[in-house]
Amino acid sequence: MKRFGTRSGAWLGAVGLAWAFAVASPSAWSAEELKAENVVDRLQIQDLITRYYNNFGRENPENFSDFYADDAELILGERHFKGKDGIMQAYGRGPPQADQPPRPPRPTRYSFIVTVSNPLIVVHGKTATAQLVYTEYVIEKQGDPLKVTTQGKEYGTFVKVDGHWRYKTRQIKGGTEPPEGWKE
């Protein structure tokens, strides 16, 4: 008998659990949302978001631009970064710009963690939207108290590229109001 690896088993378990929750509360879900394909798509998008946020604070993170479509846009407050090169610029990993001073080195911290909560993911075939709350936590040195440094909302749109979900737009915003023109 062939055994599934830990990752395969976890993935199948997550799909099964999501399906069980969906079936257990049918009044909260539309028929379209209950389709197995949509449940899997939502789980894949949630996995993409989780892996993206787990990159923060890691010594050797995955390339942030790999989470985005080629023509994607990252919006941080009033600053817009377009395409994969622009996104790499946003994270200080792109080629140096002639008109910009060099970025200071990242601060050394004992722990930097970003958590994600309340994800609302809506799939529309080959596109999707997600909104969520993120919270940044820092411990400067071992033994120091935990500090919440930032909390805000992310509004993202997604597209399927070669069978994989990628960010099309990712907007980080404070406050309670969604971005102008936002649609689930």
Name these PLM-found stretches:
Residues 127-131, 151-182:
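Short beta-strand edge/turn micro-motifs at domain boundaries
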Residues 43, 109-112, 147-149:
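Transmembrane beta-barrel outer-membrane domains
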Residues 13-24:
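Bacterial N-terminal signal peptides
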Residues 136-140, 158:
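Beta-strand elements of well-folded, non-transmembrane domains
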Residues 28-58, 62, 66-70:
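Short, low-complexity N-terminal intrinsically disordered segments enriched in polar/charged residues
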